[in-house]
Amino acid sequence: SDVLAEILNHADGVAVAGAHGKTTTSAMISCIAAASDIDPTIIIGGEVGSLGGNARNGAGSYVVAEADESDGSFLKFYPKYAIVTNIENDHMDHYGSEENIYLAFTEFLSNVKEGGAAILCMDSPKLRKLASETTTPVISYGLEHEDARYQARNIRYSVNGTCYDLYVDGVFVSTVELIVPGQHNVLNSLGAIATAQAMGIPMQQILPALKKFSGARRRFETKGRIDGIW
């Protein structure tokens, strides 16, 4: 964690934390960034086929990393963009109380560099509370909270994946197509889109990259089909 913090803190860091979804969200951000013009460095927790692994050495200013909150080591990070997918009562062996978990994420957001932002999922009650209390600028996303800046509406599921209508600040932007299934991946993709836009990546580069994203290894990974059963 010390080496990762050293790399991220001397760059335009993008750090993804949360009880669930951080590996897939960081993988989505990584694939979008790698397909864009910004040439990022990537250090994440899951292997991604299109990246050829879980790391990439880029020449650009951005470093995308997964921030592990389980032992508090994510507080060593001072990112430009801090993404939090959710906060739950997890890792109690380290934190000891619900309040300590919340305080750790409060500190994580306070570490965001000037000119950066916290990108938070408003479907998490604790993140809604944190968004109202932090002095760090917030970019919000979600399915259930009407005040979220990035929203997915009219979600359609099929055997081929998922698609939805993307709204930003209440305005329809585009239809998003994913080949990874499930509502959780709709949320993950919203966080990735919000982050990529904050990084300056145009939507015409974001959406094609997301459409090709096939998931991170060991995250609802398709292994085969036998007698019609996947």
Language model regions located:
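Phosphate-binding loop of NTP-binding sites
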Residues: 1-122, 126-136, 190, 194-199, ...
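Adenine nucleotide phosphate-binding catalytic loops in nucleotide-utilizing enzymes
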Residues: 95-102, 116, 132, 136-230
